Amino acid sequence: MEFWQHIYSNFNVIAFSIFGLKVHWYGIMYDVALLLALLLAKFFVRKFQLDINEKHLYSYFIWVEIGVILGARLGYILIYDANTMYYITHPWQIFNPYINGEFVGIRGMSYHGAIIGFLIATLLFCKKYKTNPWIFLDLVALSVPLAYVFGRIGNFLNQELFGRITNVPWGIYIDGVLRHPSQFYEAFLEGIVVFIIVYLARFKQSFQGELILVYAGAYSLARFICEFYREPDFGIGFVLWGMSMGQILSFIMFITALLVYICIKFKKVNI
């Protein structure tokens, strides 16, 4: 257990270097997550015989990836970053992967910002190709949660988004302070548990779009719980009634998903 508690003291966030370019474990985990999401999407298209051809699926993932990156980065800057005004006046720095001449990748991403970017990209894609967005959204609800697990593992390997101070034996030392390995809590609850819920819901699905709403509700609830063990974002802290910004956004997300679900399922709103 002692090795685990001091794992950050014996671990390098850089996996290897290629011609002087440092490749971080976080980047590797991000690529694994993206590839897994695509493979799972292809699997579920075949398994449930969805009306999505492979060409459209590949194109859709490209659109969504662009939307997610833009939304995640802009969302972080507008919601969490303490230097928002700097980026507004220096927009070319938003996606600058270098700090003092060293390649460090793009740091600072917001999940809730990624959701907005993802939804916008989906709507634009489906409008261009005249397809039903709910089919793609339900597919994402099935294919993303397990891939999300690797994203949180990437956060752990990158030594970021760590937990609150604790005395549990499985805690890890960060700057000499024992903290919850909250990234793994999130990987389990927001990834594995959410996937199980959405997958089971698929077999009782009563309308298109139900799975993405189930995903939104399940994820936001899981995230709300995990935030109790995760250190509040630097520079923001607790925002309202002892809640973090992540909890407030998750609460809004949960209520929105619940209201849309009720309107569609019980009021027979056409989608």
From Swiss-Prot:
Residues engaged in binding a 1,2-diacyl-sn-glycero-3-phospho-(1'-sn-glycerol): 152
KW Cell membrane (keyword) present: yes
Q: Which organism is it from?
A: Campylobacter jejuni subsp. doylei (strain ATCC BAA-1458 / RM4099 / 269.97)
In its keyword annotation, does this UniProt entry include Cell inner membrane?
Answer: yes
Report the domain of life of the source organism. Answer: Bacteria
- EC number, UniProt record: 2.5.1.145
The annotated topology with respect to the bilayer is:
Multi-pass membrane protein
Its cellular-component GO annotations read: plasma membrane
* Transmembrane annotation, as ranges: 25-45, 60-80, 103-123, 134-154, 181-201, 209-229, 235-255
What family does this chain come from, according to its entry? Belongs to the Lgt family.
Which subcellular locations apply to this protein?
Answer: Cell inner membrane
Gene name, Swiss-Prot/TrEMBL: lgt
Q: Which HAMAP family match?
A: Lgt (MF_01147)
- PROSITE patterns linked to this entry: LGT (PS01311)
Pathway given in the UniProt record: Protein modification; lipoprotein biosynthesis (diacylglyceryl transfer)
Q: What is its main location?
A: membrane
Q: Name one Pfam family in it.
A: LGT
Query: Keyword set for this entry?
Result: Cell inner membrane, Cell membrane, Membrane, Transferase, Transmembrane, Transmembrane helix
Q: What is this protein called?
A: Phosphatidylglycerol--prolipoprotein diacylglyceryl transferase
GO molecular-function annotation terms? phosphatidylglycerol-prolipoprotein diacylglyceryl transferase activity
Role played: Catalyzes the transfer of the diacylglyceryl group from phosphatidylglycerol to the sulfhydryl group of the N-terminal cysteine of a prolipoprotein, the first step in the formation of mature lipoproteins.
Q: What class of enzyme is it?
A: transferase
GO BP, sorted A to Z: lipoprotein biosynthetic process
Q: Which InterPro entries match?
A: Lgt (IPR001640)
